[in-house]
Amino acid sequence: MMRSLGRAGLLVLLLAGGQGAWAEAIPAAVGRISYGDTPAPGAAICSGALVAPDLVLTAAHCVRGAATDPASIRFDAGWSGGQPGGQRRGAAVILPEGTPVAGMAGLAGDVALVVLEAPFPPGAVTPLPLTDPAGRSFTLIAFRRDAPDQPPRRDLCATLATAPGLLGLGCAVVSGNSGAPLLARDGTGWRIVAVMVAASRGGPVRSWAVLPPAALRLRIPSSAGGSGG
C-alpha cells in the first residue's frame, strides 16, 4: 500500500521488501510489524527496531491507523525464516505532535514509537542505540510484504541528498521496508541513523529516510540507546 506525495514524486510505503544480504548476523532488535494475528499472504506489514526494552522505532504511517487500538500491533523481534526471536503486542503509540501535512515537511515527521505491552527481558533482545549520521554510506535492514516470513533484506544505501530532517538515498525500496532502520556500524556495534519512510520516483534518489527528531529521542531512555556516539 502506497500514497503519493505530489510533485516530490514520493511514494510512502506502508511496508517492506528487497534483496541482498551479507553473512554477518542481523541484529535481533530489527523486527517485523504486523497487525492482528498471523498476517495473511499479501497483508500489510512494516519493519521496526527495538530502541529500549519496551519501545519500537518505526514510521508513523505504519502505526497511525492503529493508535486507537495499539494491541492490534504485533512486533516480532529477530524474525527469521518464520521464527521470531520474541513477540510483543503494542500498548500505546507515540506520534509526532500536530496534524500530518503533505510534502517533504510531512515526510520529515513520519516517525513514531510503539510502546510494547511488556519489555523484553535483559539479554533476550538488545536494543539498538541512535546516533547522528557520519559518512554517506549506511545499511538498511528491512522486511518485505511479498515475502513476510523470510529473513530481512540487507542493502547498502548511499546518501545522495539531504533535506531538513531527511536523507535522500540511492537504494530502492519496496512495500514492507517502511519503518526499517538505516544503520551505521562502529566498534561497538550497530546504531540507528534514520528510519526508512518512502520511495522516490525519477532521478538518482530512490528513497527517503527520517532522522529521528530530538523530541522523539527524549522519549527513549538514554541507557537504552536514545543517544549515540
Positions of the model-derived regions?
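N-terminal signal peptide c-region/cleavage motif recognized by signal peptidases
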Residues: 17-18
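Conserved catalytic-core segment of clan PA serine endopeptidases
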Residues: 22-28, 35-40, 64, 70-120
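A conserved glycine-rich beta-strand in the N-terminal activation segment of trypsin-fold
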Residues: 30-53, 179
